[in-house]
């Protein structure tokens, strides 16, 4: 009996010392890995025209993998865009995030969500390009810049201090059209490549970025034309949180400001945000991208100057966005 008891004690000791760590390591390998600390990101946006920027910002704020260091605005009336972001962040309890404005540019584009912005007190917002450079200087090799608008603010930062701009970890942009243009043709097939809005408005900005020495990741029209259909919209608008209430307000201003457009948003910009922490949903490959004066972004010969996602996992992306944005 004593020998049996001794064998049981020995077996228990072996299980605890030898097998338990192995089982733990197997469980850790089977579970998805999460980063020990969030990625540091700055978002540069032309929020206030189309509605996808508002959804992109919501997704970034609700993703624990990201720490938003600041939001800069680009294109047209950047001070008004900054007021929109400022009100949005205050409403969702994130007034700790700095808001800055990039250089103002001439534009005939209608800011569909200006009424929302004008409810925020008018003030002078700081220099967006300088903010990007200051943060890159203070945290070299750590910051991802997410560009989801025309690249005027990015271009201004590059021109002002190219050496400091190179201290960014990488730049992820929504922009370009490699093989596919906007929408479908009458036969239901993707239209051929055409100038995409963000690059059309500032071709020199993309040229400067691609030659800046910072790794560039492009999410073009090929991978970002993901519609948010009525079922998904209704789930967001009925949720009733501070964040989804802002999306509801901005969505209705957008549809009211563009009555001739479809009420279905296309989530171009949230794909770029998602790529920063779930690159598996939009696998990128190395390419050499040429940019012409019209804003065409075509594949060419030469050393790769960008990693480009040409196809995204739309269902998984939408599932993730809806889950994150409606999480309490």
At which residue positions do the language-model features occur?
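Short, well-ordered secondary-structure micro-motifs
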Residues: 81, 110-112, 182-185, 229-231
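Conformational coupling and interaction surfaces
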Residues: 35-38, 55-62, 67, 197-200, ...
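Bacterial N-terminal signal peptides
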Residues: 8-22
């Amino acid at each position: 009996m004593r020998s049996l008891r001794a064998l049981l004690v020995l077996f228990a000791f072996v299980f605890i010392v030898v097998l338990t760590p192995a089982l733990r390591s197997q469980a850790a390998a089977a579970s998805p890995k999460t980063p020990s600390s969030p990625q540091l990101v700055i978002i540069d946006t032309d929020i206030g025209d189309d509605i996808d920027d508002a959804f992109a910002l919501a997704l970034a704020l609700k993703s624990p993998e990201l720490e938003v260091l600041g939001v800069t605005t680009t294109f047209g009336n950047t001070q008004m865009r900054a007021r929109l972001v400022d009100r949005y962040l205050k409403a969702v309890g994130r007034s700790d995030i700095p808001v800055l404005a990039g250089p103002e540019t001439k534009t005939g584009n209608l800011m569909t969500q200006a009424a929302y912005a004008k409810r925020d007190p008018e003030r002078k917002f700081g220099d967006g390009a300088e903010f990007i450079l200051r943060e890159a200087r203070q945290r070299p090799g750590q910051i991802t810049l997410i560009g989801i608008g025309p690249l005027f603010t990015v271009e201004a930062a590059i021109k002002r201090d190219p050496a400091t701009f190179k201290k960014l970890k990488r730049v992820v942009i929504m922009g370009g059209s490699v093989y596919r243009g906007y929408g479908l043709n009458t036969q239901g097939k993707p239209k051929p490549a055409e100038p995409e809005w963000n690059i059309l408005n500032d071709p020199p900005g993309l040229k400067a970025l691609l030659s800046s020495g910072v790794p560039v990741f492009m999410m073009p029209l090929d991978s970002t034309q993901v519609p948010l259909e009525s079922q998904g919209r209704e789930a967001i608008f009925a949720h009733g949180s501070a964040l989804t209430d802002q999306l509801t307000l901005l969505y209705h201003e957008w549809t009211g400001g563009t009555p001739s457009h479809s009420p279905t948003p296309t989530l171009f910009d949230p794909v770029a945000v998602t790529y920063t922490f779930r690159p598996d949903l939009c696998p990128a490959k190395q390419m050499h991208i040429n940019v012409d004066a019209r804003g065409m972004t075509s594949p060419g010969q030469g050393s790769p100057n960008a990693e480009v996602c040409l196809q995204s996992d739309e269902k998984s992306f939408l599932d993730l966005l809806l889950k994150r944005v409606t999480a309490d």
